[in-house]
Amino acid sequence: MKLIILIIAVFFITSINGQSVSNLPIWDKQQATLNGDWLLSKNGSKSAIYITQNNKLVFSNGLVSRTFSLAPNGATVGLELLTNDQSFLRSVRPEGEVEINGMRLNIGGLTGQPIQNYLLPEWLETMKSDPSAFQLVNYAMTEVKARFPWKKRKEWMSKELPWPLPGKELVFTYKLNAAAITLIAAKYLKNENLEYLKAISAEVHYELYDGMPVFSKWIRIVNQSAAEITINTFKSEILAATESESAVDTKKKWELPNITVESDYNFGGMTNESLYRSSIAWNIDTLYKTQVSYERTTPCLLEAYPKYGPDQKIQSGQSFESFRIWELIHSSWDREYKSLEHRRMLRALAPWTTENPILMHVSGSQDEPVKKAIDQCVEVGFEMVIMTFGSGFDVENETPQNLDRMKKLADYAHSKGIALGGYSLLASRQVGGGDDVVMPNGMSPTFGNSPCLESKWGINYFRQLYNFYEKTGLDILEHDGSYPGDICISKEHPGHRGLEDSQWNQFQRITNFYKWCREKGIYLNVPDYYFLSGSNKTGMGYRETNWSLPRAQQEIIERQNIYDGTWDKTPSMGWMFVPLVEYQGGGDQATIEPLKDHLPHYAQRLANLFGAGVQACYRGPQLYDVPETKAIVAKWVAFYKKHRQILDGDIIHIRRPDGRDYDAILHVDPAGTEKGLLMVYNPLDIAITRTISVPVYYTGIKGAVKVQEQEDQSKISTIRIISDGLSDKATLTINIPAKGFTYFILK
């Protein structure tokens, strides 16, 4: 009888868009595994699906593979990093979970695994389907689709990047059968007719990208019944991962499995760590009774779910889609290597972050100062003007006079090849009138005060944003505070019903706008981690009051901020700040104006920033005041534009700035003509000579490297590379002038 059921189940799900499973290529792990380092390789393996000899489906690109059972139910039964033959899965769990009308339902999965420490293939043959779970009925594969439209601003990009990302999407469809509905009714003591559940399907979506060890996953619930349903909550990923360490004693900080997770449901911070407050958790696995931890507290169960709600009403004929997560499977614990893999993933998943315009923060929004800033930008090669905080720029002023004036300024800027926009404060302010967030007792808004985005004020504010940018043609918004994830228990706001749907609805409100901005080519500076929802840039990571310190101290701190911030960001993902005029105090000792009186310091700041490929908010009324100042600014802009591709590339960290000796970073781009650019700074009052081991592995250069000092064609030398894997190095002896710098181009 069991054999008959198994045969029926396999027969029922043996097609992909009508293609028989027998027509799929047979999985050969050894043949499929890609050799070489994906960070350096130009030709990544293509994503595809295969069938194993025992009818398991394999989704692989030669770097990683995820294996699925098809019967007696769908489930992830393998997750491997092929390049070092490492398994990341120890136990089978449901593919997801959804709570509909108060009933928690598993999507797929198998039960009956004898222990949770590891998974043997032969165990799968006797494991069973949960009879109350959604059952796999079909699967299909398509090309990866764009998450939303992106109007590329190629003038700010150093290289063309694809959108959508090349790869494949694999979709599994699950439904509830009559037996499951009977069990659900008994479990939840439901007397009403639950037949409508048969008309609800659960889709589990996966994406795998060509040439990257990255999977994406999300779920979609389709309501084809005649009834309205409520999605109370969900889990879009339940992954029982192999633990990275086992400890008997309880630890304050565990070594998590070597997987970096990203989510497009992320807010309230400038790094991806904030996702642990919004959408991701490494939880304790309560089924893992045989773990080493005495109190069984090893965090080795990856789960993706919103911390509140979403509590969404889904009408007949409509669907609900969860947020997406991405799982980067690492092959190394080396900090630089893991960081590079993460940065490469972000650049691919959010390619608009490679738009890196050279920008100025003009301190006034009236016609004269704005036009002066535009004209100066044209003269020295800057590409964008932002009417900064405190400038008087106001997107909430919808008077015909203001809209007309801003359109004329935008037209003027565009006629000169300059992008123009301004600053708007969203969070950290109180709007009153019952439109602020109402927090539960004992809780406060992230920034002390904040409007609810689903209040009348919030809904109108976003209407104003759409209207303002559509009518003026401005093409940059600096959106301060953004939405930090504040919940709201108000029952009076028109955009949400209460606590449980407040966070989800507010997030949808703001990210729908950000995605619209991407479609229109409107650049977004957002001091929050909204990259995967459309923002271009966030703060590199600095303390604002430091720009009130004496100028000499700012020089070192600036390079420290860049060094530290580029562990988890590319140079184009983070902005810095240059106070041309006083900012939060410090007086004459902190500011650069009058510019002509502080040329050495101004030049050093430009060298710090353009040498790192990092754009800053140069805040003030002007970029230059005399020809000598103009020449210095133009020199560094020209340097950046000449070497834009390599300077926009990833940074390898050599020596952190400490003011006591040299500091250095190495830009790398193995696909470029200039494969490396070494920037070295000397903060000391004396010239120094140093011998530096340059880590050239990430340049992709083998054998020997040609090194050119600055732009001097007569100073080219060939240096033998000492081969040592990730530690491949070329030894370089260099002279660095006092309070100066030098740079070297590697080919």
Residue ranges and their predicted role:
Residues 20-50, 55-58, 64, 75-298, ...:
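Polysaccharide-binding surfaces and accessory modules of carbohydrate-active proteins
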Residues 119-154, 328-342, 405-446, 470, ...:
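Glycine-rich, aromatic-flanked loop segments that form ligand/cofactor-binding clefts
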Residues 722-747:
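C-terminal beta-strand-rich structural cap/linker in extracellular carbohydrate-active enzymes
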Residues 356-367, 388-403, 443-462, 494-506, ...:
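The substrate-binding groove and active-site-proximal loops of carbohydrate-active enzymes
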Residues 356-362, 385-387, 420-424, 477-479, ...:
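Hydrophobic faces of well-ordered beta-strands that scaffold small-molecule active sites
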Residues 366, 404-411, 415, 419-474, ...:
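Active-site-adjacent "subsite" loops/lids of carbohydrate-active enzymes
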Residues 59-62, 510-716, 731-733:
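Active-site-proximal substrate-binding groove within the catalytic cores of carbohydrate-active enzymes
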Residues 321, 335-384, 388-391:
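An acidic-aromatic substrate-binding cleft motif
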